[in-house]
Curated annotation (Swiss-Prot):
SMART domains: RRM. Residues 648-658, 692-715, 1649-1659 have a biased composition (Basic and acidic residues). It comes from the Eukaryota. It is found in: Peroxisome. This is Meiosis regulator and mRNA stability factor 1. The keyword RNA-binding applies. Residues 576-595, 638-717, 1637-1662 are annotated as: Disordered. Disulfide bonds: none annotated. Keywords: Differentiation, Meiosis, Oogenesis, Peroxisome, Repeat, RNA-binding. Residues 638-647, 659-690, 1637-1648 have a biased composition (Polar residues). It holds the Pfam family RRM_MARF1. It comes from Xenopus tropicalis.
Length: 1681
């Protein structure tokens, strides 16, 4: 396409069509290739060609023109006629006809002659002839059009004149009626939409031919035969313009070749619809030279060598854009391309941390989407778990992000599989599916897509993908290689500069609040905040320059209470301008590592007037661009309009420069790059380079920015965040009292910089601004007492809904869901709306609780700022920046003179943290605050390692000698030649008791510092050589042993040398706490806390707790079965992560041979836990030191090695444990380690029993009836509304209290975490209670067994885990719950139903009588009670029938009746409570009285005589006799009034059998012979029984009683024990020993007489028996004497 050019444009042959350039797409042609000659003539339809030419002119050949379709509805005239200037055309030579007919366009386009008619399109535009346009290189694009039905007949149109009659909206083509019947060539026509050919003559009718498929054209009737015979439908093509901006613009007709839009003169778009061979038939080249074809003046000039570039007028382009529509060719192309869908399991193949998801999506589209159209791009994840930045990037890339619940199993896989199936249902083959996952679960879907749907499968997978998944893909791409070189996610965000706007001419007759509200309404749309109002002026603050400019336009000359205000960027007072006009960053204080990256300079230029500010800001928006080679018409139009715009800006700038000698720019110019300015001192002119923001739409154009010469101006530099002093600036900006601290200025800023602009002054200004209106940025509303049983999402949505009714909400935040203390903060934009919401929604019910709503006032924030400052000042001076809470409270109140509210400390989340440690709470300063408060940005030795997060901290020592020159044995040592990898860590054996004072003495002689490299030499010179051994031979690393000494630490000097020194650079006080003298343990985030626990668990399983650094990653992977991803913790290197946990991990040595070990603090804590476990495993809770190794082996199943805990002697580490934890004493000359014990009082024991019930109640509300150990105290406080005081139960440690209730609670250890869980029995009871609640809510109180787990999860919010109950199936679990539910077989399958419980009241009476009748002083075991019950009642006692899993649990449910104890043999024994022992005596006493009743006033004396002791109701917890008798309603009741009140024995407790052993064995001191006859004795039998057939003893004396001979009356409705008749002969304990399971066959109850004759109530009068018998008689009717 770049051949030699000739004088004529169309002088080339057709042969170039067969040789396409590989580098150029087949649909892109240059204009010069659009014309050629045809020397081969084709025969006409009639066989003999007819010459219709009157004079030699170029001829147009027609070939294979198909019949046109029916005419369509004409379009309206859209574009107006745009006349172009008339230019006289040059003289055109006559074209000679040679061998064959030649193709030519019309020579002139004259509207004045009849032979040159006007060819108009549906747009109605006129193209005047003789118009010469500029030339240039124009890239034309050609695309084929649409085919039409070949059966459509030609439509004739009458032609009575040389002009074509048409209606608006049709494209007309006028052809001469004397055309030669030759073929029309198939080359493109010129780039001009109105092709003018020779004029028509009126003697032939015209045919209508479609041009664009929408507008018909006309041909003469002389072409009818030729068209019908020689135009093939396959070769007829419709070409049209594909520009979406010119869709409605019609184009002229064509015969073979491209068609062009009459607006932009461009060829159709570059989108290829069909094959190029179909567009351009393979026509042989002509064998004769073609005549030059002149082009009409609309397309170019004759005899030009360069190609014509036709640029339309700018207004015509804009008109076409207004009425633009989607591109037809592009749309058709997209529909014809095969679809492609991407399905991304982002949880399986995640974006690497810190990397850009945009790049991943871009790579997928660039590499896989060629030749396809995007039909689906979806990724599935839990958006609450995924990185928010990744989700935002995916949304910005138009990727569908489907949210699923991460807790549901395979939720993401199910969603993706559903999407794949939907894609297959929507699209057909050919289609492509891209799956980004490694999960084998997609194998089935991929198999169906490939083999059943014939889709092309591309799998992007990780290295560990299964073969079953890989087998179904056509193409495999490794995900690791695909994302190997991803760029980091470093979003360059423009730092916003707060710009001030000054408002003048405000009214003075209105209050400031009204004016502020009016100004806020005017500027609110632009983000303006009213900072202050003074007199007739006000100051408004905006986030950036653009918002301020928009606000200036809107507010200028606005009415404010009758005054027309003026707005300006510059204040009328120049001094105020210098103070206010500074760029203050809105970003939060960043870490010291990131501050330097975000450093910016703000350029402020003084100005006197506000009019020049606007012009200067406009001129800074961009620079003038040079026009280079333009390659498209679109870019030509853009460049033309851009050049016009820039030229106009230059004119304005020049005009402003003439009037005024300086440029003004009041607001700081903030860009995302550092502004580079050059200042020439002593010269008048200052040259500076202007920066222009990159425009995405003009990236393809090569525009060189020009330099501008500016007039003389004053430039003031203001440093908002100077890079060298970033830490200082941030710390002072974060402190509310930075204005009062100026002692650090000598270290922070150089004099020149500090004099230019002070960051402190900027911060003071901001503080003063904030004090004007504390609610300028909105009002915060605190919401408490939220229902923690609701989900976070539901709570957040509910809060948003109810608060949005009262105003606009900025944000709704929920605090972490811990300890039931769920709180929320709602930020509203308007203070009045916030107050209204607080008044309306306080105590509003959400869920099951009423929320507490309060407004976070500015006074509260101020008080918190004061508290924060005071807290920082105290903790900075504390050792390790930590203090116990009580000590901190004492110091704070003494220092500041007012009481400290501890709850306010918990609100300082960005300053301090409060941890539970041991038996108290610890207040610690956060590492970020410590780094900000350090004057040099690096931590002090006593401050620990907050800067580099290492236990070996970087000291402020600038340089230190690597060795001690006085004692080092290697005199030739050179620090430059020293190789750290050659350093070998010495292992020594020495006791800390000996080593510690020697190290302090060594530091004293070396002025407080000793280099670690020469420490052994210095120690040997002062004392004796250390005993060094090889690793693993019982030694401890010397470096670790030194850090075990209180007050001594190892620090890094600036030159990287480790130095042994004192922590406070002086010897520690003699009585100081050793723990406060150790290196600090910084407080980390929850991720680091978890990582520190993993490090402890990992290292304690290593030999001597030592591991090389190089083996950490593989060991971690092997131990935890997961990768240690450093980026998850916010670090880029492993060493940085290891240094971030200095309180548990110590890095020993230098170079590549460094070792990892646990710190001494972590070792002591670990040994304490192991020692307590060992002591508790001993029966005596103590161990002799001499037998310690043996006891250790029995407890932990491993040999004792003291070096496992980082010391060389047991005494060294035992002495570190507090005396409150263990006790070391001397017994018989032996050292004994024991747990200190204290005897608890009975009150404390009772409280502990009550505490056990509270623990059960609390854990029943927890998922799976368990909770973390560290959550118990706050949960207890929240649940019961009171503190859990350990001293109330007689303990000092919570764990000891838990160990005192082992029957209900067990403490599980999961690594370093402790979990509280109910015992198995309590879990079953709790689950039974839940099942009762669940079944009662179901229909018919039953549920199908398969639905149990689902309904349980829906009801209680968590799943039912069968393994918690040691079962693997639901039926097995139901067997353990047989006392609550039963399984029934129904028509619908197996159902779970509630059992019908028996009445516990009757059983209680039976058990009470059995226990009261037990005649021995020893307690009765539960098993014996079961045997007695079965022997007396004849049926076994089944506690499940009463809803209890065991009889012991049933008895425990009667705590007011009986007490259940566990003896040494682990047997449960039962006995009556002290109150019911009294009831037993009362029952026995009343049995001695007639009618079993006694007067109340006689009861005390009778009881004292019967029992032998005086009755004292207070001994039982009652104040009077009536109260204690009323406390045993099951035994007695009081009837009557006044002095006639009588104590009556209940019928259930009466003795109704003559064989009453109690009467025979009474031990009462009273003489029974002198007393009344007992009413229970029957009268003598006056009427003998019938004659018996067998001889028998009529009197029925029996010497031995057997249980089978007992007689029981019939049962009544109330009492199954026969209407109060109770057996009174019970077996003794000796009988129970020989008693086997009784047989019910031996029990033969006799029939009794009618119960009507028996005494039922003491009220009913009965006759006395005058005969007293001491024998047992059979039942007989009672007769009167």
């Amino acid at each position: 396409m770049e051949g030699n050019e000739t004088a004529n444009l169309c002088s080339k042959s057709v042969g170039w069509l067969q040789k396409q350039d590989k580098d150029v797409e087949p649909w892109l042609w240059k204009l010069s290739n659009c014309f050629s000659t045809l020397t081969q003539s084709l025969p006409s339809a009639g066989g003999n060609p007819k010459d219709y030419m009157e004079h030699p002119k170029p001829k147009v050949e027609l070939k294979d023109v198909p019949p046109p379709p029916p005419p369509v509805k004409p379009c309206k005239n859209i574009f107006p006629t745009v006349p172009l200037p008339k230019i006289q055309p040059p003289a055109l030579p006559a074209v000679q006809h040679q061998t064959g007919p030649k193709v030519s366009c019309c020579v002139l386009c004259s509207n004045s002659t009849s032979c040159a008619p006007e060819i108009r399109c549906s747009g109605g535009g006129y193209i005047h002839p003789n118009t010469i346009l500029d030339t240039g290189t124009v890239t034309c694009q050609v695309a084929p059009g649409l085919s039409f039905a070949p059966e459509s007949p030609f439509k004739k149109a009458s032609s009575t004149s040389t002009f074509v009659p048409r209606s608006a909206g049709f494209s007309n083509l006028c052809l001469e009626n004397r055309l030669s019947p030759c073929q029309c060539h198939s080359q493109p026509a010129p780039c001009y939409s109105k092709v003018h050919l020779n004029p028509f003559h009126g003697d032939h009718p015209r045919f209508q031919v479609p041009a664009l498929g929408t507008s018909p054209s006309y041909f003469t009737s002389g072409l009818s035969q030729h068209v019908e015979n020689h135009l093939a439908q396959s070769e007829y093509l419709s070409h049209y313009c594909t520009s979406s901006l010119h869709f409605n613009t019609p184009s002229s007709a064509f015969l073979k070749g491209p068609h062009f839009c009459n607006v932009c003169f461009e060829k159709p778009s570059s989108s290829k619809v069909t094959d190029s061979h179909k567009i351009w038939p393979n026509i042989p080249p002509p064998n004769t030279s073609s005549a030059p074809i002149p082009i009409c003046n609309g397309c170019g000039t004759q005899e030009t060598v360069k190609e014509a570039a036709l640029i339309l007028a700018k207004n015509l382009c804009k008109a076409s854009q207004k009425y633009g529509s989607p591109d037809l060719a592009t749309g058709q192309m997209q529909e014809n391309l095969p679809p492609i869908g991407v399905f991304w399991d982002i949880e399986n193949c995640s974006v690497p941390s810190g990397r850009s998801a945009v790049t991943v999506v871009k790579r997928i589209r660039e590499r896989l989407f060629k030749g396809h159209r995007e039909a689906e791009f979806i990724c599935v994840c839990d958006i609450s778990k995924e990185n928010k930045e990744v989700i935002e990037e995916l949304n910005n890339c138009q990727v569908t992000v489907a949210h699923i619940n991460a807790t549901a199993k395979n939720a993401a896989d199910d969603k993706l599989r559903q999407s794949l199936r939907r894609f297959a249902d929507t699209h057909t083959s050919p289609a492509t599916v891209v799956l980004v996952s490694t999960d084998v679960n997609f194998a089935l879907e991929l198999s169906d897509l490939r083999h059943r749907h014939s889709f092309h499968i591309i799998l992007i997978h990780k290295n560990q993908a299964s073969e079953a998944l890989l087998h179904h893909a056509h193409e495999l791409i490794h995900f690791e290689e695909f994302i190997s070189d991803l760029p980091p996610r470093l979003p360059i965000k423009m730092q916003q500069c707060q710009t001030l706007l000054y408002v003048y001419n405000l009214p003075t007759n209105r209050d400031a609040k009204s004016i502020s509200n009016r100004l806020r309404r005017l500027s609110d749309n632009c983000g303006g905040k009213v900072m202050s109002i003074s007199g007739t002026s006000a100051i408004l603050r905006f986030a950036n320059q653009e918002s301020a400019e928009r606000a200036q336009k809107r507010m200028e000359n606005e009415d404010v209470f009758g005054n027309r205000i003026t707005v300006s960027f510059t204040p009328r007072n120049k001094e105020v301008n210098e103070t206010k006009n500074s760029c203050v960053s809105n970003e939060k204080a960043k870490s010291p590592k990131k501050v330097n990256k975000n450093t910016k300079l703000c350029l402020s230029i003084k100005d006197d007037s506000s009019s020049n500010t606007k012009a200067a800001s406009k001129s800074a928006c961009g620079s003038v661009s040079k026009n280079s080679n333009v390659k498209s018409l679109k870019e030509l139009c853009q460049m033309q309009s851009k050049s016009n715009k820039t030229s106009q800006q230059e004119k304005d700038k020049k005009r402003n420069g003439d009037k005024q000698g300086t440029l003004s720019q009041s607001s700081p110019l903030c860009t995302n790059q550092m502004l580079q300015t050059a200042r020439n001192v002593g010269t008048d002119n200052t040259a500076s380079k202007s920066f222009q923001k990159r425009d995405d739409t003009t990236r393809k154009s090569n525009a060189d920015s020009q330099k501008e010469q500016k007039n003389k101006e004053d430039v003031v530099f203001q440093i908002s965040n100077p890079s060298a002093f970033s830490k200082l600036t941030e710390s002072r900006q974060a402190s509310p009292f930075c204005s009062s601290q100026s002692g650090w200025s000598s270290r922070s800023l150089s004099p020149s910089l500090s004099n230019c602009s002070s960051p402190i002054a900027t911060n003071q200004t901001g503080a003063a601004d904030n004090s004007v209106d504390p609610f300028a940025n909105g009002a915060d509303i605190q919401i408490g007492n939220l229902d923690y049983r609701m989900s976070r999402k539901e709570l957040q949505q509910t809060l948003h809904d109810i608060f949005s009714r009262h105003g606009k909400i900025k944000n709704v935040e929920l605090s972490p869901h811990t300890d039931y203390q769920l709180k929320a903060t709602v930020q509203m934009e308007n203070l009045q709306e916030a107050i209204c919401a607080v008044n309306s929604l306080h105590r509003y019910k959400i869920g099951s609780k009423r929320i507490q709503v309060s407004l976070a006032t500015g006074a509260t924030n101020k008080s918190l700022s004061l508290l924060s400052f005071g807290t920082v000042s105290i903790l900075q001076d504390a050792p390790a920046c930590c203090l116990p809470l009580f000590k901190f409270t004492e110091i704070y109140e003494k220092k500041f003179g007012h009481k400290l509210i501890v709850s306010d400390l918990y609100r300082l989340t960005d300053t301090v943290t409060i941890r539970d440690q041991g038996n108290g709470r610890l207040v610690c300063l956060l590492p970020s605050v410590q780094a900000r408060q350090s004057p040099m940005g690096s931590s002090q030795s006593h401050d620990g390692s907050s800067a580099n997060c290492s236990p070996v901290v970087f000291e402020e020592l600038e340089y230190h000698e690597p060795i001690c020159r006085r004692h080092c044995s290697n005199r030739k040592f050179s620090g430059h030649d020293f190789d750290p990898d050659s350093y070998i860590i010495p292992f020594v054996i020495i006791s800390l008791k000996t080593f510690a004072p020697q190290v302090h003495s060594l530091l004293q002689t070396h002025e407080g510092t000793v280099p670690l490299l020469s420490f052994p030499d210095c120690y040997a010179a002062e004392f004796s050589a250390l005993k060094e051994v090889q690793e693993g031979q019982g030694g401890v690393p010397l470096e670790h042993l030194i850090t075990c000494i209180p007050g001594v630490n190892i620090a890094f000097a600036q030159n990287g040398i480790k130095v042994v020194k004192w922590i406070h650079n002086k010897p520690p006080p003699p009585n100081s706490d050793p723990w406060l003298l150790r290196s600090k343990s910084p407080v980390g985030n929850p991720q680091l806390i978890q990582f520190s626990r993993e490090v402890i668990d990992l290292l304690k399983n290593q030999p001597s707790c030592i591991m090389p650094v190089t083996k950490f990653i593989p060991t971690y992977h092997h131990h935890f079965a997961k990768q240690c991803r450093v980026s998850d913790y916010g670090y880029s290197k492993l060493l940085e992560l290891l240094e971030a946990v200095p309180h548990v991990l110590q890095i020993l040595g230098m170079g590549s041979k460094r070792l990892l070990t646990l710190t001494h603090r972590a070792q002591v804590k670990r040994f304490t836990q192991d020692l307590l476990k060992l002591l508790k495993s001993q029966a005596s809770k103590q161990v002799i030191v001499r037998e310690f190794s043996q006891a250790y082996h029995w407890c932990f199943s491993r040999d004792w090695n003291v070096t496992e805990y980082g010391v060389c002697d047991l005494v060294d580490i035992v002495s570190e444990i507090p005396d409150t934890t263990i006790c070391v004493s001397q017994q018989d000359g032996e050292s004994v380690i024991s747990i200190p014990k204290r005897e608890r009082t009975p009150e404390e024991v009772e409280r502990t029993k009550q505490f056990s019930k509270e623990v059960v109640d609390l854990l029943r509300h927890q998922p799976h009836f368990r909770m973390p150990f560290n959550k118990f105290i706050p949960s207890y406080h929240h649940h019961f509304g009171r503190q859990c005081k350990l001293t109330y139960y007689g303990f000092t440690k919570l764990l000891d209290l838990f160990e005192a209730i082992p029957d209900v609670l067990q403490v599980l250890e999961c690594g370093e975490e402790k979990i509280l869980a109910l015992t198995e029995m309590e879990r079953i009871k709790a689950l039974a209670s839940q099942l009762v609640k669940l079944l009662r809510s179901q229909k018919d109180s039953s549920i199908n067994m398969p639905d149990l787990l689902t309904e349980y999860s829906k009801t209680f919010g968590y799943s039912l885990r069968l393994h918690d109950y040691d079962v693997s199936s639901v039926p097995a679990l139901m067997q353990k719950l047989c006392h609550v539910v039963k399984i029934m077989d129904t028509d619908l399958g197996k159902q779970i139903q509630l059992i019908n419980r028996k009445s516990l009241r009757s059983l209680t009476a039976q058990l009470l009588i059995l226990l009261m009748s037990w005649d021995e002083s020893s307690s009765l075991t539960v098993e014996q009670l079961c045997q007695v019950y079965q022997s007396v009642h004849g049926i076994p006692l089944n506690p499940c029938e009463y809803g209890f899993v065991s009889l012991a649990e049933l008895l425990k449910s009667l705590p007011y009746l009986v007490e259940v104890h566990t003896n040494d043999l682990c047997e449960d024994s039962v006995q009556l409570t002290s109150l019911y022992v009294f009831a037993k005596n009362v029952r026995s006493l009343l049995h001695t009285y007639h009618y079993q009743q006694i007067f109340l006033h006689e009861f005390p004396n009778a009881y004292s005589k019967y029992v032998g002791e005086v009755l004292q109701p207070k001994q039982y917890g009652y104040s009077s006799l009536e109260e204690i008798l009323g406390a045993i309603p099951q035994v007695v009741w009081i009837k009557g009034h006044g002095h006639k009140r009588i104590v009556v024995l209940k019928n259930d407790m009466k003795v109704c059998h003559q064989m009453d052993k109690e009467l025979l064995c009474l031990t009462s001191p009273m003489d029974l012979l002198c007393g009344p006859v007992p009413s229970c004795l029957p009268s003598p039998q006056l009427h003998p029984d019938p004659v018996v057939t067998q001889p028998a003893d009529l009197i029925q004396f029996e010497e031995h009683f057997h249980f089978s001979d007992l007689v029981y009356p019939e049962e009544t409705q109330y009492n199954p024990l026969c209407n109060g008749t109770q057996p009174c002969n019970f077996p003794t304990s000796a009988d129970l020993d020989t008693f086997s399971e009784p047989s019910t066959q031996n029990i033969c109850p006799q029939e009794s007489k009618s119960t009507k004759e028996l005494p039922e109530s003491p009220v009913k009068r009965q006759h006395r028996n005058r005969v007293k018998l001491a024998a047992n008689f059979s039942f007989a009717p009672v007769t009167k004497l």
